[in-house]
Regions:
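Radical SAM enzyme core and accessory elements
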Residues: 12, 360-517
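Acidic, low-complexity intrinsically disordered segments
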Residues: 1-167, 171
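Residues at alpha-helix caps and immediate loop-helix transition turns in enzyme cores, especially N-
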Residues: 25-29, 55, 71, 158, ...
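Radical SAM [4Fe-4S] cluster-binding motif and immediate context
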Residues: 116-272
Length: 517
């Protein structure tokens, strides 16, 4: 119990970091702390209270102070003032970012390099988890939907410090080191030096298998960066590239500077390298984007072939221009976190529901990697664009109640829904779905909806085992199935997933030739 653990230490002050995902629970917890220890100071910080400190203080009497903005310098100054029995509002020099009732300060933006946050207790708990690393703060952009541009101009920390932290985190047992620099390649020299350092030490001082995640601006990538990324071992790098929209009017309205032509070209180039997991983002609910234009952005993004296309929904964050300038950005949004858009002049609530259902279908079929071939075949055979396909599939899933059903049940639902589309050959549909299931499910077992009793399968398994070129590896599980649309046998040995796609390698042999080899 978090409250019990806090009170067990009999604290004189309790400080909370507040984010979208924890603000409601944090305020309840703060009230409980104040009720149990009325003399203890309750202090909040973090992005969810930095731009609305006066409102939070007015609505929450249990909160004594808010530290707005960066806190590395202000936290120790506040604690020193409280420990000395002095009023923090009267501290000299002033405590940056300090907010109290009747005393508000602008969010603190530090110019110097922050101290290392990597205490031994943090490092000891990283095994099998994600470690977070920043080598810069601030953002060169000022997107109206985002807070990053409110955090000051970009400031890059010393490279030697970044290199030390990379080695420390990579050796901690974490499976991923995620750079939280808002635009990692905004300073190409800094970014390239870090990439080169990782590549130089990967597999030596940096254990093989550790993955490094970067958020990039795709349209400003330089040739030197491409050359470094191309050298990365498969699965060593993950790239996240925010597109948000391909509608030029929308991008201009939200003050997002993007060369969409260069962006598309560069994403295709990164995907074609085949050694990195590429994640791209779209946001639904932005200005001037209706269902038709959003569909165009979706189809454009889907065609780029990234391993993940995330369909997110606009959130009206405290401090973001889209929340603070409602006349310019009119929309209805939830008053509760995460403040998600409910209606815009261009999208009705019903249309947003269509997109949410499409997002669910996209996650299950494409982003999961589970039904890539199934979706590709169904779209091509039925003549549907990706956007229409996922909107219709999502709507059918919502009607069917697929939200929490097991994978085998969803497979059956997907098969039956796709089979009813015009132009679908059921044998070819089954082939695609069998390949998907074998490539992503290491049991090698097919669900009942794809199961066919055929004596030929047993003969094929035996024949594969007899041929040295296709014999199974000792002690390795194998999956085998017949493909009736193409008259092939498909088999897979579950040894190692592709580190980029997360799928196992499939092998096929012609049924007609199998018994003559």
């Amino acid at each position: 119990d978090v409250l019990a653990r806090i009170l067990d230490g009999e604290p004189d002050a309790v400080l909370f970091s507040c984010y979208l995902w924890n603000i409601r629970e944090t305020l309840r917890l703060a009230a409980a702390v104040k009720a149990a220890r009325p003399g203890a100071y309750v202090v909040l910080g973090g992005p969810e209270v930095s731009y609305n400190a006066g409102e939070v203080l007015a609505e929450n009497p249990q909160v004594d102070y808010i530290l707005s903005g960066e806190g590395e310098r202000s936290v120790p100054m506040l604690l020193a003032s409280l420990a000395a029995g002095r009023k923090p509002e009267e501290a000299a020099p002033p405590i940056p970012g300090l907010c109290a009732r009747g005393f508000l300060s602008a969010p603190c933006v530090e110019e110097g390099t922050p101290p290392s946050p990597y205490a031994p207790a943090y490092l000891e708990n990283l095994r099998g988890r994600i470690a977070y690393l920043e080598t810069s703060r601030g953002c060169p952009y000022a997107c109206a939907f985002c807070l990053s541009g409110r955090c000051g101009k970009p400031r890059w920390f010393p490279l030697e410090q970044a290199k030390r932290n990379i080695l420390t985190l990579a050796r901690s047992g974490a499976h991923t080191v995620k750079f939280i620099d808002r635009t990692f390649n905004a300073n190409p020299a800094h970014a390239n030096a870090i990439l080169a350092f990782i590549l130089k030490h990967y597999g030596r001082d940096i254990p093989a298998g550790v993955c490094f995640h970067f958020e990039l601006a795709g349209d400003i990538l330089r040739e030197e960066t491409f050359a470094l990324l191309e050298q990365a071992p498969p699965g060593a790098f993950q790239l996240e590239i925010g597109m948000q929209s391909f509608c030029e009017k929308t991008l201009a309205a939200v003050r997002r500077k993007t060369d969409t032509g260069v962006l598309k070209q560069n994403i295709r180039r990164l995907v074609a390298m085949g050694n990195m997991h590429v994640h791209i983002d779209l946001i639904a609910g932005l200005p001037h984007e209706d269902l038709r234009t959003f569909g165009e952005s979706f189809n454009t993004g889907y065609a780029l072939g990234a391993q993940m296309l995330q369909l997110g929904f606009l959130k009206l964050l405290h401090g973001a221009a889209m929340r603070e300038e409602p006349e310019e950005f009119p929309c209805v949004f939830s008053e509760d976190p995460p403040y998600e858009v409910q209606k815009t002049p261009w999208l009705s609530p019903e249309e947003l529901d269509v997109l949410r259902a499409a997002e669910d279908a996209l996650e299950r079929c494409y982003n999961s990697g589970r039904f890539l071939e199934t979706a590709a075949y169904a779209m091509a055979a039925a003549g549907l664009s990706p956007f229409v396909f996922y909107c219709r599939l999502g709507a059918a899933g919502a009607r069917h109640g697929t939200a929490n059903i097991p994978l085998d049940d969803y497979t059956a639902f997907l098969y039956n829904w796709c089979a009813a589309l015009p132009g679908i050959d059921k044998a070819c549909l089954r082939d695609a779905m069998v390949r998907d299931r074998l490539a992503t499910n290491s049991t090698g077992r097919l669900p009942q909806c794809l199961h066919v009793t055929d004596a030929l399968l047993g003969r094929a398994v035996k024949r594969l085992a007899q041929n040295p070129a296709t014999a199974p590896l000792p002690g390795v599980r194998r999956g085998v199935a017949l493909l009736y649309g193409t008259r092939q046998v498909v088999f897979v040995d579950y040894t190692q997933k592709n580190p980029v796609t997360g799928r196992y390698l499939l092998h096929t042999r012609s049924i007609d030739n199998l018994f003559t080899e």
